[in-house]
From Swiss-Prot:
The gene is argH. NCBIfam families: argH (TIGR00838). It comes from Rhodopirellula baltica (strain DSM 10527 / NCIMB 13988 / SH1). Keywords: Amino-acid biosynthesis, Arginine biosynthesis, Cytoplasm, Lyase. This is Argininosuccinate lyase. Signal peptide: none annotated. Gene3D superfamilies: Fumarase/aspartase (C-terminal domain) (1.10.40.30), Fumarase/aspartase (Central domain) (1.20.200.10), Fumarase/aspartase (N-terminal domain) (1.10.275.10).
Length: 460
């Protein structure tokens, strides 16, 4: 059976090898719900402008609904010679209602049809990813109260830097995920423009109503230029970029918790339901889910690179190259969705190892910066205080003690501006209590943030 897309200009049969090479039904069949919804809206518009009768519209609509049911149940066979989901649906319609079905494609091309289908699929998928991001934010937030009294080392260059409250870590990831949500919302605005009505490349001479179709499909507006619309895949690339950044954030979190779960760090216990063992080493409990999250992020970023290379150097307007946008698009969203679905239960089920963390929290001179700022607050220039505290830390290292255990006489030997009140800011607990600034790990600031995020996520 020849595809409905082949006109009378063709005098030769399609080579079977081309049918297999050019098909996209193996991956674009997942667009069928959007394709049928778009076709019903298009047919309704054709009825409104007088290009279909009321009876013709109802017959097309009802038959498309029947075809949708068959696709839901997997009853409609897929054939390479019909190329894509659009032709499968149209041919099924024609097989059932004949010439009336042939009227559906009036004032429409597969160029604007696939663009619209893809926009609707991305729009729905963005909303689903957004909901998963909220769930992951809620998972991090749910840890904050129980972990509030735990002090962790913050790292720069993977070296211990300053002490922070554990909830400060969780809030940091909530902020990253919120930026991801903001990017989704911003991207969605550009996705949510209806392509239907630009036809192949130049528009149509027929009296269609593009706004009517856009409204029926819940688009915010219509695209402005037929040439641009026919060629545009910015919305595919941009949405995949958003997925790539989400994947990057998840990869960073996974890497951190992989490190934290090692004997060397011994900060966290990953739920065993999300770990696997070794085929030879019986003692192993490996954080495979987190490792796969770190690894799968590369697939999402690779999809973005594929799309960027796909669209470069394409002249206006539509080119068949653009058919290849869907495998990387679908894979990027599918992979990101899978990563998020597993991230939330891991975050909720993990346990910080309080005793192990507390046993080593005073190592690494995490209170050195607080000591420097104590000196600055007493009038010492920052660079002078910075140099002096470095010398104090060096002395403590030589003696093998913490800053809070260093004798006052040693401090005063290095600076006569230091008195016994210095011990009020030494030690990680005192250092935490000394913080004041907005956005810091100060307990009051952290509680403010927890309260704000509790309210925000309740309304998300």
């Amino acid at each position: 059976m020849a595809s409905p897309s082949r006109s009378g200009v063709f005098q030769a049969e399609t080579d079977a090898r081309l049918e297999a090479y050019a098909e996209s039904i193996s991956f674009d069949s997942r667009l069928y719900e959007h394709d049928i919804r778009g076709s019903i809206a298009h047919a309704n518009m054709l009825r409104e402008v007088g290009l279909l009768t009321e009876d013709e519209f109802k017959l097309i609509r009802d038959t498309l609904e029947t075809i949708r049911g068959e696709l839901d149940r997997g009853e409609l066979p897929m054939r390479f010679e019909l190329e894509d989901i659009h032709m499968h649906v149209e041919q099924a319609l024609i097989d059932r209602i004949g010439d009336t079905g042939r009227k559906l494609h009036t004032a429409r091309s597969r160029n604007d049809q696939v663009s619209t289908d893809t926009r609707m699929w991305i729009r729905q998928s963005l909303d689903e990813i957004d909901a998963l991001l909220v769930d992951l934010q809620s998972a991090f937030l749910s840890r904050c109260e129980n972990d509030f009294d735990i002090i962790l080392p913050a790292y720069t260059h993977l070296q211990r830097a300053q002490p922070v409250l554990a909830p400060h870590y969780w809030l940091a990831y909530i902020e990253k995920l919120e930026r991801d949500r903001q990017r989704i919302a911003d991207c969605r605005k550009r996705v949510n423009q209806c392509s239907l009505g630009i036809a192949a490349v130049a528009g149509t001479t027929l009296p269609i109503d593009r706004q009517h179709t856009a409204s029926a499909l819940d688009f915010e507006g219509i695209t402005a230029n037929s040439l641009d619309t026919s060629s545009d895949r910015d919305f595919v690339v941009e949405s995949t970029f958003v997925m790539s950044l989400i994947a990057s954030h998840l990869s960073g979190w996974a890497e951190e918790w992989i490190l934290w779960s090692t004997v060397e760090f011994d900060f966290i216990q990953i739920p065993q339901a999300f770990c696997t063992g070794s085929s030879i080493m019986p003692q192993k409990v490996n954080p495979d889910t987190l490792e796969l999250t770190r690894g799968k992020s590369a697939r999402v970023m690779g999809a973005l690179q594929t799309l960027m290379l796909l669209i470069k150097n394409l002249p206006l307007a539509y080119n068949r190259d653009l058919q290849e946008d869907k495998p990387p698009l679908f894979d990027a969203f599918d992979t990101t969705r899978a990563m998020l679905e597993l991230a939330a239960p891991i975050v909720r089920g993990a346990e910080l190892k309080r005793e192990s963390i507390a046993a080593r929290i005073e190592k690494g001179y995490l209170d050195a910066t607080t000591l420097m700022e104590w000196m600055i607050a007493r009038g010492m220039p920052q660079r002078t205080a910075h140099h002096l505290v470095g010398a104090i830390v060096s002395e403590a290292m030589q003696q093998g003690v913490t800053l809070s255990d260093l004798p006052l006489e040693t401090y005063q030997k290095l600076s006569d501006q230091i008195d016994e009140s210095v011990y009020e800011v030494l030690g990680t607990s005192n250092a935490i209590a000394a913080f004041r600034s907005e956005g810091s790990t100060a307990p009051a600031r952290v509680r403010e943030q927890i309260k704000q995020w509790t309210s925000r996520l309740e309304n998300a």
